[in-house]
């Protein structure tokens, strides 16, 4: 492994209420252990998580987000996870400043939906149709497939498919940025069950921002 084991935390983001399910996240707390682009991308590919975060300044929340195949300016799941791990109120990924807070059970970040530029959503007639989709469905480009489970209550069933030729992730268990995009499109708070059972909460915030939250735990 490129980074020393002691420098790597693995945490579970967007857990269900009983602690099961989640999207795992690798966090390298000292980014100096992987000082260049090649070493960071190699470690992200080796770990194989949907994202790995390298912390370059823990006090200012400066972070570098990598999938197994590319660098990302913004991603929701890793920022919720690293906000919980570092216990700070502001993060600074390449996209811009992200505010964070905790309420005891959930960790929340507030972000701009226009930062989500590489994904599209597609509504299906029922949760059963979403569940029946192959992984991945035919086609190219990042797809967030969703259906109402209970529209009045804002409950959504969703699955996320990166469909990137350079990415080893066939299906993303919990996708914060796509949940932000869907919330902006629908203009309402949502309670999303994604993947095998991960839970994502969202809500519109002032000035066109979107707040997204979930439970975070250490893995193992």
Predicted regions span which residues?
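Active-site proximal loop and beta-alpha junction motif in alpha/beta enzyme cores
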Residues: 1-220
């Amino acid at each position: 492994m490129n980074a020393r084991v002691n420098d790597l935390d693995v945490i579970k983001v967007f857990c269900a209420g009983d602690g099961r399910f989640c999207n795992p996240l690798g966090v390298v707390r000292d980014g100096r252990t992987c000082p260049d682009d090649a070493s960071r991308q190699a470690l992200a590919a080796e770990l194989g998580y949907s994202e790995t975060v390298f912390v370059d300044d823990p006090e200012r929340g400066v972070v570098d987000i990598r999938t197994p195949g590319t660098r990302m300016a913004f991603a929701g799941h890793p920022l919720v996870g690293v906000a919980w791990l570092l216990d700070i109120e502001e993060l600074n990924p390449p996209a811009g400043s992200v505010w964070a807070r905790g309420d005891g059970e959930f960790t929340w970040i507030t972000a701009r939906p226009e930062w989500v530029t590489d994904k599209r959503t597609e509504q299906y007639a029922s949760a059963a149709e979403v569940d029946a989709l192959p992984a991945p469905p035919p086609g190219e480009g990042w797809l967030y497939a969703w259906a109402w489970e209970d529209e009045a209550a804002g409950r959504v069933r969703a699955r996320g498919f990166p469909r990137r030729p350079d990415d080893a992730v066939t299906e993303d268990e919990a996708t914060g940025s796509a949940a932000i995009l869907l919330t902006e499109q629908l203009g309402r708070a949502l309670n999303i069950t994604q993947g095998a059972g991960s839970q994502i909460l969202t809500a519109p915030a002032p000035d066109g921002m979107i707040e997204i939250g979930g439970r975070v735990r250490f893995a193992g």
